[in-house]
Amino acid sequence: LWTKVNQFEIEGLPQSALKVVNTIAKKAKKDKNDAQIVKSMLFKSKFALILEEDAQLKVINDFKTEIAQSEFPTTNILESLLANLYWQYFQENRHTFYNRTKTEEKVDTVDFRTWDLQTLFEEIHLHFKNSLKSGLMLQQEDLRQYYVLLQVATESNGSKSAAGMVIGSNASSGSGAQSYVQFQA
């Protein structure tokens, strides 16, 4: 089915691709295939952002819902992805955030688009931190089921990298988080 999604995407038919992704997502939920659930979420998000105006809020809320329903290590992966979604939103709208006044509390606890810069960065930090929970277990986690999501580095002995290395790298330096960390300091 992913081949169909890719074909529809190449043909410029995101609506058709989204229908196939929704089918994949339903099957993944039924089969409790966490890697396919996460992959389908990423593609649903991608197509929502193409097809719907202001889809960011829905995408973020979908990730929060899935995090609440997931277990280790899927929760950790989703937390990392959510932090990155917030970070990408900041990157695309940094001028707006730099012009906002800091508020005492979140103006709207659900709609991150109304938050000030400090509130957004606190949320990013929270989700990166959550992605690193159970660090020792993450380092020992077998990633084979997540090959559909990650480009896994193969060590010289042929064993696969630990999830903790991938998520830890993401939380500390991936996706432009260096700027975030420097700003926080």
Segments (PLM) and residue ranges:
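Extracytoplasmic/secretory-pathway proteins
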Residues: 1-185
